[in-house]
Swiss-Prot record:
Name used for this protein in its record: Ferredoxin--NADP reductase
Pfam families: Pyr_redox_2
Record carries keyword Flavoprotein: yes
EC number in record: 1.18.1.2
Gene3D superfamilies documented for this protein: FAD/NAD(P)-binding domain
Cytoplasm listed as a keyword: no
Superkingdom of the source species: Bacteria
GO molecular function: ferredoxin-NADP+ reductase activity; flavin adenine dinucleotide binding; NADP binding
The protein's required cofactors: FAD
Length: 332
């Protein structure tokens, strides 16, 4: 199968579409750069959108509290002022500097070219731990969910949540007011979630099934209709009627191919200097993926690092450009 090739050479290509990457895309536009952003997930927003879109964040400057998905929506509106090219469902496999100084990025879908690269991949590419039942994959994209983007789709439905951590318990509690019924199944007697959340769960109408594991999905070509649960200790089985199944077994994250790009890596993070420069000229890193003395992993810090990385990339491309940009109030 031939791989598509985008021969356009961008000023900057951002690897990772989480909040830091999205703000970097906006800032690249602000500095009149041609920007592309590549994200491995089906949507922008990184872990905010994939793991806890309905949760509130309390440590973003200027927001006493902001729902995670709302922050993502605002970031998208902001970056769309400059219409960056967005590539979703693409994982970058190789990054290679060519003889002319430009970078060649090969993903699972196509080949890209860029004058500079900014890596904002958070904790690396992450994929959900999947339900290990033979027929599970055929229901992905139907009524078996690993990501939740819209709580409303579960309104009036019988929902089974699998898992015992914070995500499983939090989703169960958030679904309780809108779903017809919510059942949570966990293979252990005790939940790993925050104590306060577990207490709320006990007081709620959520049906708790412990220690059980799902062992079989019963359905047709359209959807799962029933889930068979097995008691971990006794081996007895129960059948539950469902309209939707949500699996929260956590995520597997790793730097993956990034480790093979010749970058200086320290404790699973990319080493950068005060200009967000890596050891490869023209390649920068920002957000949780990077490390330096005094590094703090916060969204707020990533928002500060993104403009530094962009401005460094700008001056790399054009040495006559100013590192210090003009204030945004004078640009619109």
């Amino acid at each position: 199968m031939s791989v598509k090739e985008d021969r356009n050479v961008y000023d900057v290509t951002i690897i990772g579409g989480g909040p830091t990457g999205m703000f970097a895309a906006f800032y690249g536009g602000l500095r009149q750069m041609k920007v592309k952003i590549i994200e491995s997930l089906p949507q922008l927003g990184g872990q905010l959108a994939a793991l806890y879109p309905e949760k509130y964040i309390y440590d973003v400057a200027g927001f006493p509290k902001v729902r995670a998905q709302e922050l993502v929506n605002q970031l998208k509106e902001q970056m769309d002022l400059f219409s960056p090219t967005v590539c979703l469902n693409e994982s970058v496999d190789t990054l290679e500097k060519q003889e002319d100084g430009t970078f060649k990025l090969v993903t699972n879908q196509q080949i890209h070219y860029s004058k500079t690269v900014i890596i904002t991949a958070g904790n690396g590419a992450f994929q959900p731990r999947r339900l290990e039942i033979e027929s599970a994959s055929r229901y992905e994209g139907k009524n078996l969910h690993y990501f939740i983007n819209d709580l409303g789709q579960f309104s009036g439905k019988r929902v089974l949540v699998c898992g015992g951590g914070d995500s499983a318990v939090d989703w169960s509690l958030m679904l309780e007011p809108i779903a017809q019924s919510v059942t949570i199944v966990h293979r252990r007697d005790k939940f790993r979630a925050h104590e306060h959340s577990v207490e709320q769960l006990k007081k709620s109408s959520v049906q708790v099934k412990t220690p059980f594991v799902p062992v079989e999905l019963v359905g047709d070509e359209h959807a799962i209709r029933q889930v068979i649960l097995e008691h971990v200790k006794e081996g007895t089985k129960e059948t539950i009627d469902v309209d939707a199944v949500i699996v929260n077994y956590g995520f597997i994250s790793s730097l993956g191919p990034i480790k093979n790009w010749g970058l200086d890596i320290e404790k699973n993070a990319i080493k950068v200097n005060s200009r967000m420069e890596t050891n490869i000229p023209g390649v920068y890193a920002a957000g949780d993926i990077c490390t330096y003395d005094g590094k703090i992993k916060l969204i707020a810090c990533g928002f500060g690092e993104a403009p530094i990385a962009i401005s460094s990339a700008k001056t790399y491309i054009d040495p006559t450009a100013r590192m210090q940009p003009a204030h945004s109030t004078s640009l619109f």
